[in-house]
Amino acid sequence: MDADFWLDRWREGRTHFHQTRVTPLLQKYWPTLDVPAGGQVLVPLAGKSLDMVWLAGQGLRVLGVELSQLAVEQFFDENDLRPEIHQSAQGRHYVAGNLELICGDVFALEDATLAACAGVYDRAALVALPEPMRKRYAREVYGRLGRGCRGILITLDYPQDQMEGPPFSVDDAEVQALYAGHTEARLIDRRDILDKEPKFNQRGVARLDTLVYRLERLG
């Protein structure tokens, strides 16, 4: 996935991945992480996700990263927030209370920014990336998070030869390989969601599971 592909999706309104509600799996499993109040939570490829509003409501400082300026502006407009804006080497920062979105490339985040994160939430980032980028993403983003950083990762597992991504299939074997050596990825939930995803049914996908992981950055 290159930047133009992602930006075109937002410009053309092809954003079926955007949910109009908070993710129930986030609400169920995030409290088990015990991320300290006031801790900074990274949300990569954030779009305009309502999950960020929920996380902020838990007393956390949310740091979303999103390439599309349109998505960032829609997030603040749709949530009646008026952000302060400033520029840095990491991108264009939009800040409103304990919500901050950087309009920029997640790979441009500085070491200090990632090391300061106490938590990470990834519902739509890893599965949006083709395989070569997934390896780089796990290494250069997760590999630079601070020791003890905890998070929730949600992926999809389906026969990749039955549908072209994104979202891509990222099964448990790949997750373990991607995070080996720097992050513990423990599978805590797996459920069949094929009957809830008509797009996959229409394309002839025979099986579709969602997988939920508890992540912890190792020392």
Curated annotation (Swiss-Prot):
Sequence positions that bind S-adenosyl-L-methionine: W10, L45, E66, R123
InterPro entries reported for this sequence: SAM-dependent_MTases_sf (IPR029063), Thiopur_S-MeTfrase_Se/Te_detox (IPR022474), Thiopurine_S-MeTrfase (IPR025835), TPMT (IPR008854)
EC class of the enzyme, as a word: transferase
Keywords, alphabetical: Cytoplasm, Methyltransferase, S-adenosyl-L-methionine, Transferase
Broad class of the protein's primary localization: cytoplasm
UniProt signal peptide: none
Originating organism: Bordetella pertussis (strain Tohama I / ATCC BAA-589 / NCTC 13251)
Lineage: Bacteria, Pseudomonadati, Pseudomonadota, Betaproteobacteria, Burkholderiales
SUPFAM superfamilies to which the protein is assigned, alphabetical: S-adenosyl-L-methionine-dependent methyltransferases
A molecular-function term among this protein's GO annotations: thiopurine S-methyltransferase activity
Xref: HAMAP family: Thiopur_methtran
Top-rank taxon, per record: Bacteria
Catalytic activity: S-adenosyl-L-methionine + a thiopurine = S-adenosyl-L-homocysteine + a thiopurine S-methylether
GO terms for biological process, alphabetical: methylation; response to metal ion
Entry protein name: Thiopurine S-methyltransferase
UniProt xrefs under Pfam families: TPMT
A GO cellular component annotation in the UniProt record: cytoplasm
Subcellular localization, as worded in the UniProt entry: Cytoplasm
PANTHER family per UniProt: THIOPURINE S-METHYLTRANSFERASE
EC number: 2.1.1.67
Family: Belongs to the class I-like SAM-binding methyltransferase superfamily. TPMT family.
